[in-house]
Amino acid sequence: MSTVLVGFDFSTGSAYAVDLAIDIANRMQMDLMLVYVKTKDEDETPIRAEIERRNAGVAHLLNGIKMDYVIREGKVSQELCAQAKDCDAQLIIVGTHGMSGFEKNWIGRNTYRTIAESDVPVLTIREDFNFKKSLERIVVPIDNSSDTRQKVPVAAKFAKLFDSELHILGLYTSDNTSIRGIVDGYVHMVDTYLEKAEVKHVCTCVNVPKNLTVTTLEYADSVDADMIVIMTEQESSLTSFLLGNYAQQMLTLSHRPVLSVRPEQVNSVSK
């Protein structure tokens, strides 16, 4: 059975990630794998005891799936991605502390690198997210880049799992009629795809007066969205593994879960 993998470090954010991961894994009918990446000097015994204690506390929530854990040593991003390959993970979920958390570098170092290096989509969850409600509305921004639509099958999969409504947000980054026409065409194609797939959705196009991130987040606020789906390849740097400004800003500023998808990842959780 395929697996949903969760990066775990005993933080509030990672505990929330486990909660949502259990829900997602139950709906996908995939096993759940928790991964703790320790430093060289950490004693594994108390780590193992605490993970087993916490797992026992949520075991009753599992619906026909298994939950296991593994303790690895090394760099967080490398070990998470390696474990994802080892257990045929279709999705990685990580909790983040955000810019106000006790470990500011987590969002800048471990999360960014995990997303950039991962072969599967990565769902990041902030510890200030409201987990009392389901994923009712999911925002899918569409720009004029050639691969912007490739995140739609993954978003549609989540929408069907949670009976969510997709909000397709066309982003006009220019007054140029050709560029706006490309966005309109892509939104129309997505609309047709989702109609055939019988996925609830609405389509909206807006101007981008500031930047893509701010406009997307303002729209997400206006519809009380529960998740945002972005592509990472189109924003990635050509000279390094680091994500581009749009993805970095979205991951840092969004208090909602962000699902980051690369073009070659569309066949994983969208199956």
Task: Cite the ranges covered by each PLM segment.
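A conditional alpha-helix N-cap/helix-loop micro-motif detector
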Residues: 14, 73, 104, 148, ...
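Short, well-ordered secondary-structure micro-motifs
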Residues: 45, 105, 135, 151, ...
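Rossmann-fold cofactor-recognition segment
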Residues: 66-69, 203-205
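Gly/Ser-rich helix-loop-strand patches that form or flank binding pockets
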Residues: 81-130, 221-271
